[in-house]
C-alpha cells in the first residue's frame, strides 16, 4: 500500500509514456528523461498516449512499487509540456486518481445510479 510521508514529492512525467514498460523500464525513464533518482523516495506518475491509463512508481526504501489505474470513462488531466516533469502535491495526485481535474477539483464524471 502506498503511504509515503508528507515530505515526498510527486512528479508527473509530461508527455506520453510507453505503458508496456514495467518497473525497470519506468525507473530507467526517470533517470534518463527526467534526470532524477528513481530510488530517492519520490513518486513518479506516467500517462499513456490514450490518456486513460496511468502508472505510479515509488521506491519506499525497501523496494519499488508499481501501481496502475485505467479509467473506464474519460481521461486523466495531464500538464501540457511535452517533456520534463511537473511537481504536484499528494492531494492533487489523489484527485487525479479519482478522475477529478487536479488543477480545479470538481468531479469530471459520475457513474449512473443503479436501479
Identify the residue ranges that each predicted region occupies.
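Polybasic/polar functional segments that serve as interface/processing modules
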Residues: 1-115
